[in-house]
Amino acid sequence: MATFDKVKDIVVDQLGVDEDQVTMEANFTEDLEADSLDIVELIMAMEEEFDMEISDEEAEKMSTVGDVVNYIEQNQ
């Protein structure tokens, strides 16, 4: 499964949004209505799924689904 598909599944599961809302350009807070706790939980789920650690500093830079996908692909 491609990185985007895995990330999309996690976002749909964690935020309860429709799959078609989750695009590379979708902003977590503006488009997907995630709050700060949702984002922390998303990052934790990504770390578990991809067996990696994402620093708080890096997590703060991630505002879109594409940001997360690109970070994972560059750091796996």
Swiss-Prot record:
- Cystine pairs: none
Q: Does the keyword Cytoplasm apply?
A: yes
Q: Which UniProt keywords apply?
A: Cytoplasm, Fatty acid biosynthesis, Fatty acid metabolism, Lipid biosynthesis, Lipid metabolism, Phosphopantetheine, Phosphoprotein
Summarizing the function annotation, the protein's role is: Carrier of the growing fatty acid chain in fatty acid biosynthesis.
Q: Which residue positions does O-(pantetheine 4'-phosphoryl)serine occur at?
A: 36
User: What protein family does this chain belong to?
Assistant: Belongs to the acyl carrier protein (ACP) family.
**Which GO cellular component terms are attached?**
cytosol; membrane
- Per UniProt, residues of the Carrier domain are 1-76
Q: Which NCBIfam families match?
A: acyl_carrier (TIGR00517), PRK00982.1-2 (NF002148), PRK00982.1-4 (NF002150), PRK00982.1-5 (NF002151)
Q: Which InterPro entries match?
A: ACP, ACP-like_sf, PP-bd_ACP
A molecular function (GO) term: acyl binding
Pathway per the UniProt entry = Lipid metabolism; fatty acid biosynthesis
The keyword Metal-binding appears for this protein: no
List locations, semicolon-separated: Cytoplasm
> An example of a Gene Ontology BP annotation on this entry?
lipid A biosynthetic process
Q: How is it modified after translation?
A: 4'-phosphopantetheine is transferred from CoA to a specific serine of apo-ACP by AcpS. This modification is essential for activity because fatty acids are bound in thioester linkage to the sulfhydryl of the prosthetic group.
Name of the gene encoding the protein in the UniProt record: acpP
Q: What is this protein called?
A: Acyl carrier protein
